[in-house]
Amino acid sequence: MRTAIVYASVHHGNTEKLVKRIAEECQVDLIDAVKQPDADLSSYDMIGFASGIYFLKFHQSILEFVEKNLPDDKKIFLICTYGGSANYKTIEQILDKRHASVVGKFGCKGYDTFGPFKLVGGIAKDHPNEEDMKNATDFVKGLH
């Protein structure tokens, strides 16, 4: 099954760290939504979207990528890193319009220094850690 993960990793590289580990251990292609905003996904059987959570949603580049590039009727999985909590609502609304089937979701803590967290040196400083990366890799392996 040909699989890609489209990701955005902006502030601390949490999401990129996670998806690069997944790519090392699983047969997936990585697509940076910021650097490759027009990537063609038509040849993939399953597509993952991965992002940190920004203002309770996936990064804007991911949301725009889905709107613009996702072929209808694809199997989708979602991965997020977060300081506060996971939130899939906005991206799931967009995916629903594209008749995509969400086959799984994975989230883990990620180092966060946004807003008031900066005053205390950030939260989730050691995340994603080895356990988070193993869990993410196991999650993707379990989808195949």
Task: Go through each PLM region and give its residues.
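FMN-binding flavodoxin-like domain, especially the glycine-rich phosphate-binding loop
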Residues: T3-V6, V10, E16, R21-D29, ...
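A short beta-strand-loop structural module common to alpha/beta enzyme folds
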Residues: Q27-D38
